[in-house]
Amino acid sequence: MKFPTLLIAAGLLCISVHTTAQPGPRKKVGVVLSGGGAKGMAHIGALKVIEEAGIPIDYVVGTSMGSIIGGLYSIGYTPEQMDSMVRRQDWSFLLSDKIPRSEQNMAEREASEKYVFSLPFGKNAKTQAVGGLIKGQNLANLFSELTVGYHDSIDFNKLPIPFACVSENIVNGNEVNFHKGVLATAMRASMAIPGVFTPVRLGSM
């Protein structure tokens, strides 16, 4: 990434604020947000601390949970708004493939009450390979709702705060850097943990 930045790794933050004026142009500040599942929520608090310290953020880079927090921050969500959003979500529903009860027919409602989760079966009762236990459609829907206004394919450098996120091509193991595209899709691809969430198919990948 060609960011002339001072990188701050959230979660391993050591902030030193100098009040003495420095000669020359201000150094660019970039925030790197790692993964870590639920622990990734700590990134929200880290962003709040950085803001309260008066440190301007010029770039945001994230992976997995960090890509979600970073992506939302890059389009204007404040740490307070993200904290409130996280607290009011039904995570047991989001981290499943359950259809909202209001959209289920009678058979689907009965099945959802009987089973915690299900796997697709093919011929001879063999489970079909799905790439992960969770398709993540409910999360994808949430990301789409939260990124209204940014559904087109865009250059992430042109977001209110330039953003990038990282994923992996499960076919060849190569790193995939997202600097453009559909923001919600990039966030979903970055959090596609092999064996847990099904991968996101993008173009020829």
Predicted regions and their residues:
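Bacterial Sec-dependent N-terminal signal peptides
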Residues: M1-R26
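Patatin-like phospholipase
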Residues: T20-T63, G71-M205
